Structure formats: structure tokens, C-alpha cells
A protein has these predicted regions:
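Thiol/disulfide oxidoreductase modules built on the thioredoxin-like
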Residues: 120-122, 129-179
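Hydrophobic beta-strand anchors of alpha/beta hydrolase catalytic cores
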Residues: 64-65, 96, 154
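N-proximal helix/coil linker or "cap" segments that precede and/or mark the start of modular domains
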Residues: 25-45, 115-118
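Short pre-active-site segment immediately N-terminal to redox-active cysteine/selenocysteine motifs
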Residues: 61-63, 68-71, 150
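Structural microenvironment flanking redox-active thiols in thiol-disulfide oxidoreductases
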Residues: 79-121, 133-141
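Bacterial N-terminal signal peptides
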Residues: 14-27
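N-terminal secretory signal peptides that target proteins for export/translocation
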Residues: 1-10
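A short beta-strand-turn-helix
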Residues: 42-63, 86-89
Length: 187
């Protein structure tokens, strides 16, 4: 005797189940926070004159200007400390400005940069250099060009926009703080 509950095809059942699953999770997708993930942020391309304009625009603050790249091992060591320092001193008058020296014309290199930013989620603006040619380095700092264009490179500016510290190596959090705190105290 034949069963009245005989299944002739599982295809409609599977499609119906899939539709129910999508319907069930769709309210979660709608109610998720609207903030875009950090790795989708746009990175503005900067020329040397833009870097100088960023320093001038932050007159009255201590500017911590750092150049780095995702392929730079010391940069990976230093970056978490820069984030800690930025979070600790951002309300005290420190502005961190980061410029990536990844190749902005290479989609995979720029993609690596965006991925890294998504993973680290820095609380400061990150730009990308317009060029990796000597003119960019010279335009930012003749000293940097003369010293071999190494990374990471940091320049720290006082509240008047005068460069008071220059490093072409990774800094520790303690070194950053020992440079920044006296500049914050000087008004």
C-alpha cells in the first residue's frame, strides 16, 4: 500500500527552507549598525604640499606625522603604540597624521593597506602618498630624502608648526610620550 505522505521531490522543500532562512536573518541585517567597516574607508591621496597644509591646518596642536607601509616590519611594531598614544592624548591636543607609502597605483598594495586599516581601526586620518618617487620624499622633507627614505619616518611638530623631532626608525610608546608631553605642556 502506498503512503499518503510520499515525497516526490525534495527540491521545492529545499527552496522553501532556504527562503525561510533568508527571511529569518534579514531583520538582523537591517538592524545592524550603519557604520561602514574601516577597511572600506577612502584614503585621500596626498602630495607633499598637502602634507604641509595638514600640519598648518593643525596649528595649535602637537602634530605627530608618521610615514609607514604595510610591507615595513618595524611599522607593524610601531603602529599599535601610535594608536595607543593617539587615544591617550587626542583630547589633550595631539593630532596624529599617518601617510601610507604603499603604492597607490597598485590595487593589491592599496588593498593590503585598506585591509590593515580595517584590522587596526586607527582613530586618526590615514592618507596615501601620491608617489614613491624621490620628489615626494624631498617635497616632504629634504632630510628624509638625504637620509635614504627609510620607513617608518616620524616628524613631531610643536603647537606653532615647527618640527622639533625627526626619526627614521620605529618609536616605542615611551619615546612618543616623552616627546609629546613636554610639547603639550608648553603653551
Amino acid at each position: 500500500m502506498r503512503s499518503p505522505f510520499r515525497v516526490t521531490s525534495l527540491k521545492p522543500f529545499a527552496l522553501g527552507l532556504a527562503a525561510l532562512a533568508l527571511l529569518a536573518i534579514s531583520p538582523l541585517a537591517v538592524s545592524a549598525p550603519s557604520a561602514a567597516p574601516a577597511d572600506t574607508r577612502e584614503m585621500k591621496v596626498v602630495q607633499p604640499q598637502d602634507v604641509h597644509a595638514l600640519i598648518a591646518a593643525n596649528k595649535g596642536k602637537v602634530v605627530f606625522l608618521n610615514f609607514f607601509a604595510t610591507y615595513c616590519v618595524p611599522c607593524h611594531t610601531e603602529f599599535p603604540d601610535i594608536i595607543k598614544m593617539a587615544r591617550k592624548y587626542q583630547n589633550a591636543g595631539v593630532q596624529v597624521v599617518e601617510v601610507s607609502m604603499n603604492d597607490n597605483s597598485d590595487p593589491s598594495d592599496k588593498g593590503a593597506m585598506l585591509k590593515w586599516l580595517g584590522e587596526t581601526n586607527p582613530p586618526f586620518p590615514v592618507y596615501i602618498a601620491s608617489s614613491l618617487e624621490d620628489d615626494f620624499y624631498k617635497g616632504v622633507s629634504p632630510q628624509w630624502a638625504k637620509d635614504g627614505e627609510g620607513l617608518p619616518m616620524t616628524m613631531i611638530f610643536d603647537r606653532d608648526g615647527k618640527m622639533v623631532h625627526y626619526y627614521q626608525r620605529a618609536l616605542t610608546l615611551a619615546e612618543m610620550e616623552s616627546d609629546v608631553t613636554p610639547l603639550l605642556a608648553a603653551k
